[in-house]
Amino acid sequence: FGKTLNMSMLKCFFEIGTDQSLFEGLYISKNKALCDAYMGKYPVISISLKGVNADSYENARSLLKRIVMEEAKMHRIIMSGNRLDDIDKAEYMSLVTGDMGEDTLVYSMKTLTALLEKYYEKKVIVLIDEYDVPLAKANENGYYDQMVLLVRNLFENVLKTNSSLKFAVLTGCLRVAKESIFTGLNNFKTNSILDEEYDETFGFVDDEVKEMLHYYGQDTHYETV
């Protein structure tokens, strides 16, 4: 646990227009150079695929379209002014009307990154929480092959050779084989909660485990836990 909270924190830190007072007094605020370079400096696309829980491929695809559409609506400011031309604005409207064919859907996030980069003149950060849920539910309900193809195409388009992408962070509970949906991605790095680099970022830290075991009178089970 802690995945969604961390993704929310990343969005709040990087996103243009963020409330910088949220980080006042925190450890990261002591690194002024880092904050000046990154805090509130980038457009951010942030979606959670937790809601793609369906008993059929058609319903799952509809839920995914809804998630993309709602995220695109969050960036409607790009329709203001003249930074985007009429063709760009038509592309944006195709993402928010809900009338999205599968070809539009698999390019939807890449399209949105391109539009955001053009408007802000900044590379775009992409955050995808619970990326594995659609595949887990598809496996349970017998449409895994269809869903893995859709998710692979969506991810490859936005994450691979996308000149508008600054970087992306994905979180999930299951270790989905890299070959299934991340084929050919460059600079792909996998971390688990067992990695020392993040062992104090997710779940409980060591002192918290000891405190809970002591509270329940289970101190002798520390090594097992």
What are these regions, as identified by a protein language model?
Residues F1-V225:
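Phosphate-binding site recognition
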